[in-house]
A protein has these predicted regions:
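Conserved PLP-binding catalytic core of the aspartate aminotransferase-like
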Residues: 83-84, 93-128, 144
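PLP-dependent aminotransferase class I/II
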Residues: 15-94, 99-102
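Short hydrophobic/aromatic beta-strand micro-patches
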Residues: 37, 110-112, 147-149
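Short acidic/glycine-enriched loop/turn segments that link adjacent beta-strands
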Residues: 30, 105, 139-142
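PLP-dependent enzyme catalytic core of the Aspartate aminotransferase-like
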Residues: 124-128, 133, 137-169
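Nucleotide-activated donor-binding/catalytic signature segment of Leloir-type glycosyltransferases, i.e.
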Residues: 8-16
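Structural motif corresponding to alpha-helix initiation and N-cap regions
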Residues: 3-4, 19, 115-119
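Conserved PLP phosphate-binding loop immediately N-terminal to the Schiff-base lysine helix
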Residues: 1-7, 26
Length: 169
C-alpha cells in the first residue's frame, strides 16, 4: 500500500507545517504527543504559543514512551498498514451504501449520503453508541467525519448503516 507524506513540501513552501500526532499511528491517543515539521520561524511561533493551546506538559514517562514509539518503525508501519486497509475497506462499503466522500489519505472519511441527511444518521448512530462527528456548519452540514477505527468497529458501523438505510429510503 502506498503511503504519502507532505514532508518533502516543507522545503518548497515556507508557510507549510506538517503535523503528526501519535494518536492512531502509534496507538498513543491518551498521551497527547505529536510533532510539527516546517520552516524554523513557524516552529518558533508554535513554541511561543504552545501553552495557550495545550497546558499539559509532557512528563518524563511520556517523553520516554514517545521516543520509544518513534524508534519502533516496524510497529508504526504495521499500524499504518492496518489503518489504510481498514479505511479502504470502509470506503468501499460506504460507497456501496450510497455515501460519497473526497479522495483522502487521512485517518478519517468525510462522508455524505445522497438521500439521507447527515444529522439524522449522526443521531441514529449516537443512539447505538457509535460515535462519529457532525458539524452543523454551512457547506459541511450534510457530512459526517468518520474516524477509521479498528476493523471490528468499522464493521459495526457498516452493519448498522446497512440496516438503518434500508429502513429509511
Amino acid at each position: 500500500m502506498e503511503r504519502k507524506s507532505a514532508l518533502e513540501l516543507i522545503e518548497k513552501y515556507d508557510n507549510l507545517l506538517v503535523v503528526q500526532t501519535f494518536s492512531k499511528s502509534r496507538s498513543m491517543a491518551g498521551m497527547r504527543i505529536g510533532f510539527a515539521c516546517g520552516n524554523p520561524q513557524l516552529i518558533r511561533f508554535l513554541n511561543d504559543v504552545k501553552y495557550s493551546f495545550n497546558s499539559y506538559t509532557m512528563d518524563r514517562t511520556t517523553l520516554v514512551t514517545g521516543v520509544a514509539a518513534i524508534q519502533d518503525k516496524a510497529y508504526f508501519t504495521e499500524t499504518c498498514e492496518k489503518i489504510i486497509a481498514t479505511r479502504e475497506w470502509a470506503k468501499k462499503e460506504l460507497a456501496a451504501l450510497g455515501f460519497t466522500f473526497p479522495d483522502s489519505k487521512t485517518n478519517f472519511i468525510f462522508a455524505s449520503h445522497k438521500s439521507c441527511p447527515a444529522k439524522e444518521i449522526f443521531e441514529a448512530l449516537r443512539q447505538e453508541h457509535i460515535y462519529v462527528r457532525y458539524f452543523p456548519k454551512p457547506r459541511i452540514d450534510n457530512h459526517l467525519r468518520i474516524t477509521v477505527g479498528t476493523q471490528e468497529e468499522m464493521e459495526k458501523l457498516i452493519h448498522f448503516l446497512e440496516k438503518y438505510l434500508k429502513n429509511h429510503k
